[in-house]
Amino acid sequence: DKRLDADISPKPTIFLPSVAETNLHKTGTYLCLLEKFFPDVIRVYWKEKNGNTILDSQEGDTLKTKGTYMKFSWLTVPERAMGKEHSCIVKHENNKGGADQEIFFPSIKKVATTCWQDKNDVLQFQFTSTSAYYTYLLLLLKSVIYLAIISFSLLRRTSVCGNEKKS
């Protein structure tokens, strides 16, 4: 009952591991969310980039949402494999061109070292963001006080000048 011209192939959204997860647990979890596909029959598996071995992964149930379906799958990568790139392969009858959809995920170590050179960088970034927020609030408060003073001065001047008799 789907329109023939509608694109009902799986639409992927990817989520990469957090810096906290990779630093604290020495693992990283890639998440692939597939949405707005029809019919519900779909196969998802994971491989290392340019590899042939299917990796152990988990997936949620296929859920129906507004006439289409969604599913998510995730791969938890141990520390020894964080330097490798991975891909999520999606088999679905409505994939464009009839080929399997391959979604690439970058190396966790490459992303982590690119983002934060040092563990203190995260704290520095948080401190900088918080400082910027409070500076903005302070400037906003200053502007509101300045507006009140100028408005009061203008109103007072108008009332004083308005009572004078004109000749």
From Swiss-Prot:
Q: Which SMART domains match?
A: IGc1 (SM00407)
Q: Where in the cell is the protein located?
A: Membrane
Q: How does it sit in the membrane?
A: Single-pass membrane protein
Swiss-Prot/TrEMBL keywords:
Immunoglobulin domain, Membrane, Receptor, Transmembrane, Transmembrane helix
Among SUPFAM superfamilies, the record links this protein to:
Immunoglobulin
Main localization of the protein? Answer: membrane
Q: Note down the stretches annotated as region C region.
A: 1-134
- Domain of life according to the entry: Eukaryota
Provide the membrane-side ranges marked Cytoplasmic in the record: 156-167
- What's in the GO CC field? external side of plasma membrane
Q: What is this protein called?
A: T-cell receptor gamma chain C region C10.5
Originating organism: Mus musculus
